[in-house]
Amino acid sequence: MKKPVVAIVGRPNVGKSTLFNRIIGERIAIVEDTPGVTRDRLYSEAEWQGKVFDLIDTGGLEFSEDLITTKVREQIEKAINEADLILFVCDSREGITSTDEAVAKNLRKSDKPVILVANKVDDYLNPPANFYDLYRLGLGEPFPVSAANGTNVGDLLDLVISKLNFPEDYEDENPVVKIAVVGRPNVGKSSLVNALLGEERVVVSDIPGTTRDAIDTPMWYQGKPYLLIDTAGMRRKSRIEEDLERYSVNRSIKAIRRADVALLVISAEEGVTEQDKKIAGLIHEYGRGVIIVVNKWDLIEKDAKTADRYKEHIYFELGFLKYAPVIFVSAKTGQRLNKLMELVDRVSFEHQKRVATSILNQVLREAVVLNPPPADRGRPLKIYYATQIETKPPTFALFVNDAELMHFSYLRYLENVFRQNFGFEGTTLKFVLRERGRTT
């Protein structure tokens, strides 16, 4: 039995994301005074009284003909269908609007249990005058809270728990592979996530930057759990002026750091850009598993050698990621998405691979005999032995006589030898030099 699902819905700027963040205890949804800053469904696991449930934060409901608004409304309808319980958040200071009335009408039709949450009540013994208008929505007694300062949120969670059915034993028996989907704006990240999920869960538009939040979306593929992190497209920080966009960029960086495997999405039409290089550098720096995903491959005129030429172009521009596999896909047509998930499994396995010390040192000795390390000012570098000290990424300690004698080119040689013998496809390798109790 799966965990129960609670969805937070309401019109823009009533405090849904603030309540979401208050419940889960982290700043995951972007909170801003600008209406409509949460466009997509955000998923997070929440716990109260030892009970675990999934919490969904949705974009603000607005009933207009605007393209993004229409798509957001579709997202919310899907969230309502998925939810076991709905928290309908209203602004107790502003009172009822026509949008509130329209949302309430839809919720009454849904036949789902609803808690009407009256937000922005700092003193629930003396609520704002407009608080009492909320009774007119026909959804029962408004529950007063202040998401900003936490007033009455604990009591709200008590009520939530009382209305949910929980499995007797919930065990996370399968480790979850965390996948960050990263890239510049409008290269098809959201379309790729939706294609993998088989539904439109992330707002997709031709307008660059329509995904503002890093959205954690659970999925199952061939009986295994994954967590997809669809990040806001990263722009150069120098071009970002609004606090909202700057926070989105920082969130994208955090998404890379949280991931096991990063999918670097590149547009087949545009090729590798300077911004792609910067994002690739972040993935490499943080030591994540990485797959280079060339999207929109269906739009390219091809011959028998097009893919090989394109791969050469990628490795020329991203020379430091030559260990990363390249796959050509189309989120629009679904081309090679099964192969992509197979690659994710393979890179995840390599990212956490561990090599026995005895085998590692046998390969190391052969490498040193075949190509001895160069001497520096007459002093030879001696490598005594190696051992693997970490995974995610695989990290090796090399015990030497003098760490300053190790040239970066020889470390690169050893890295290539380790890859030839042990694989490590799609993952950074790191080396730590140790000598006489010192670490460098």
Swiss-Prot record:
GO biological process, one term: ribosome biogenesis
Keyword Nucleotide-binding: yes
Database matches in CDD domains: EngA1, EngA2
Binding site for GTP 2: 183-190, 230-234, 295-298
Record-linked PROSITE patterns: G_ENGA (PS51712)
Superkingdom of this protein's organism: Bacteria
Sequence positions that bind GTP 1: 10-17, 57-61, 119-122
GO molecular function: ATP hydrolysis activity; GTP binding; ribosome binding
Residues covered by the KH-like domain: 353-437
Keywords: GTP-binding, Nucleotide-binding, Repeat, Ribosome biogenesis
Pfam families for the chain: KH_dom-like, MMR_HSR1
Domain annotation EngA-type G: ranges: 4-168, 177-352
PANTHER family: GTPASE DER
Family: Belongs to the TRAFAC class TrmE-Era-EngA-EngB-Septin-like GTPase superfamily. EngA (Der) GTPase family.
Quaternary structure, from the entry: Associates with the 50S ribosomal subunit.
Function according to Swiss-Prot or TrEMBL: GTPase that plays an essential role in the late steps of ribosome biogenesis.
HAMAP family associated with the record: GTPase_Der (MF_00195)
Entry protein name: GTPase Der
Organism: Carboxydothermus hydrogenoformans (strain ATCC BAA-161 / DSM 6008 / Z-2901)
Gene coding for it: der
